[in-house]
């Protein structure tokens, strides 16, 4: 059988686990290629702990390469377009095609979707946001707190309940 190529788009938890499991299960001749824009992997589930001072940023971040199994290829690039039928991906590093395509790009908050969000709302979906939330919690003297989900999908579905 000819060697196959699997393209994994995204180096978050979903992409990382998928790529590492594929590398473990596939024939050694098959290629597993992760395409990710960030050099470092941020374990986003720990942003809550960062926000409340139970972790430091250096404890929840690692070079992505260190987390990939030996034999998993890494392409540092932004994904520009995806043609799922052709299993073709256009990136800032060129065009890639594969025999299979895994899309694990995650969700990004659209802070402009809700008027006034940028001016008054806080979220902990980034280290900077977690730090801003920590500051607000530290100075909070009581009153009402509104927890809102503006639209689906959103990062970390359990977050509003935590």
Q: What would you call each of these model-derived segments?
A:
Residues 2-73, 150-162:
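Beta1-alpha1 glycine-rich phosphate/pyrophosphate-binding loop at the start
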């Amino acid at each position: 059988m000819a060697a196959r190529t699997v393209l994994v788009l995204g180096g978050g938890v979903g992409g990382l686990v998928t790529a590492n499991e594929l590398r473990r299960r596939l024939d050694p001749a098959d290629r597993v290629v992760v395409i990710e824009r960030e050099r470092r992997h941020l374990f986003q589930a720990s942003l809550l702990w960062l926000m409340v001072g139970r972790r430091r940023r250096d404890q929840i971040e690692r070079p992505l390469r260190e987390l990939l199994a030996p034999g998993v290829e890494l392409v540092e690039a932004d994904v520009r377009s995806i043609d799922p039928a052709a299993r073709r991906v256009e990136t800032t590093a060129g065009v890639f095609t594969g025999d299979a395509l895994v899309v694990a790009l995650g969700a990004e908050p659209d802070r402009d979707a809700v008027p006034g969000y940028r001016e008054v709302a806080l979220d902990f979906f980034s280290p900077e946001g977690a730090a801003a939330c920590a500051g607000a919690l530290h100075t909070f003297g009581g009153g009402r707190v509104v927890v809102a989900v503006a639209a689906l999908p959103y990062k970390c579905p359990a977050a509003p309940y935590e």
